[in-house]
Amino acid sequence: MFRTLLKSKIHRASVTHCELNYEGSCAIDEDLLDAANLGENEQVHIWNINNGERFITYAIRAERGSRIISVNGSAARRAAVGDLVIIAAFAQVHEEYVAGFRPKLVFVDPDNRIKEERSTIPVQMP
């Protein structure tokens, strides 16, 4: 049996561009793609913290070091420049590998600079 697990996450990234007339996708600074182990054309889920929108698209490369997060195509209607988003991708993992599987979690500052990288999520406390 396979389980679907969180593979990659860029947490609280700031949307820098919304390009309605661009052919779909989400352009992500190549440094962030690498840090989060996201590949070009990989399916990503985007969760908009500001308005609650959740949608699926695919990642494309933005210039390395540009700190760009550009929501493109029809998805541009679901975000605005300055919105905070979580970008996530999932993997199908065979159950024998689940216990040892660790996601790549990337936390960024308001300017989309990497401030922390982790592979675990702390236990939520009351």
UniProtKB/Swiss-Prot annotation:
The UniProt keyword set, sorted, is:
Autocatalytic cleavage, Cytoplasm, Decarboxylase, Lyase, Pantothenate biosynthesis, Pyruvate, Schiff base, Zymogen
UniProt subunit comment: Heterooctamer of four alpha and four beta subunits.
Listed name of the protein: Aspartate 1-decarboxylase 1
Residues annotated as binding substrate: T57, G73, S74, A75
Instruction: Identify the pathway.
Output: Cofactor biosynthesis; (R)-pantothenate biosynthesis; beta-alanine from L-aspartate: step 1/1
Instruction: Report the CDD domains cross-referenced here.
Output: Asp_decarbox
Could you tell me the gene encoding this protein?
panD1
- Species annotation: Polaromonas sp. (strain JS666 / ATCC BAA-500)
- Which GO terms of the molecular function aspect are on file? aspartate 1-decarboxylase activity
